[in-house]
Amino acid sequence: VTDDADLVARLRREGLEPSSWSNGPHDVYGAHDHGYDKVLVCVQGSIRFGLPAIGSSVELAVGDRLELPAGTTHDAVVGSAGVTCLEAHLVAGSLGDGPRRIASGEW
C-alpha cells in the first residue's frame, strides 16, 4: 500500500510540486483543456477521465498516474467513494504527445 507522503515524495523527486484536491462521490467535470502539461496521481478513491479526442477513457485508482499534455481535452467523473488526487503542472510540451496512464507500481 502506498501512502500520500510517499506519492508526494516520488513526484518531488521528479522536480514536481504537487498540490492536492478532493471531490465527493459522482462529481462531474465537463470537457475542458489546459495550456500547461498536467500530472495527476490518485491518492484516495477513484476517478474516470474521458478523453474524447481519442474516443476512450481511463480509470485512476490509488497510486495510478495520468499525464495530460497541454491542449488535451478531458472530462471526469468521480467514483462512488469520492477522490483525492495530487496534481502538478509543467510547461507545455514537457510530456510529449498524447495522454498516458501509468499504473500504480509502474512509475
Model-derived segments and spans:
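Short acidic-glycine-tyrosine-enriched beta hairpin
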Residues: 54-70
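Double-stranded beta-helix
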Residues: 2-21, 75, 79-107
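Short, charged/polar surface micro-motifs in flexible loops or helix N-caps
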Residues: 15-16, 25-26, 44-48, 55, ...
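Conserved short histidine dyad/triad with adjacent acidic residue
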Residues: 17-34
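Short, conserved beta-strand element in jelly-roll/cupin
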Residues: 33-49
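Histidine-centered metal-chelating micro-motifs
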Residues: 28-29, 65-66, 70-75
